[in-house]
C-alpha cells in the first residue's frame, strides 16, 4: 500500500514522505490514527506543501532546539516517587513524569515522546535522561528522584 505520511512515524519517515507499507499496517494503524493518507496523483501538490512547510519550520526549530538544549543542560529536575523499604521505587519514572517536572521547574515544555530513557529509572538518586529536540540535536536533562514524605 502506497501512503503519504502526515505525521512523523518512528522508523518509517517524516511528514511528506511517500512510503510503501503492508496493507494491514496502513489500514489498521496509519490511516485510522491520521498518520498517513492514501497516495494519489492529486496528493502530489500536498506533498510539496508539507515538504516546503517542514523545511521552513526546520530552520527555525534548529535554532530553538539549540536554545532549549542549553537551558536543559543546566537544569536538575526533581521527581517525587513512592519508595519501598530497600530504596527501590514502586513502578518507574515515566517520560510523562519527567516532562511535567521540567515544566514545573521552569524549563521548556517538552513532549513526552521526545524524552528517551535508555533504562528504567527505578532507584533513588540522580539520573541523566536524553531528550530528542531535533533530528540532529539531542540534549540531556538531569533527573533527581526523591522519596515522598
UniProtKB/Swiss-Prot annotation:
Q: Which Pfam families match?
A: Ribosomal_L9_C (PF03948), Ribosomal_L9_N (PF01281)
Q: InterPro entries attached here?
A: Ribosomal_bL9, Ribosomal_bL9/RNase_H1_N, Ribosomal_bL9_bac/chp, Ribosomal_bL9_C, Ribosomal_bL9_C_sf, Ribosomal_bL9_N, Ribosomal_bL9_N_sf
Q: Which organism is it from?
A: Cutibacterium acnes (strain DSM 16379 / KPA171202)
Per UniProt, which keywords does this protein have? Ribonucleoprotein, Ribosomal protein, RNA-binding, rRNA-binding
Higher taxonomy: Bacteria, Bacillati, Actinomycetota, Actinomycetes, Propionibacteriales
Q: Provide one Gene Ontology biological process annotation.
A: translation
Q: Which gene encodes it?
A: rplI
Q: What is this protein called?
A: Large ribosomal subunit protein bL9
Which family is this protein grouped under?
Belongs to the bacterial ribosomal protein bL9 family.
GO CC annotations on file: ribonucleoprotein complex; ribosome
> What exactly does this protein do?
Binds to the 23S rRNA.
Q: Which GO terms describe its molecular function?
A: rRNA binding; structural constituent of ribosome
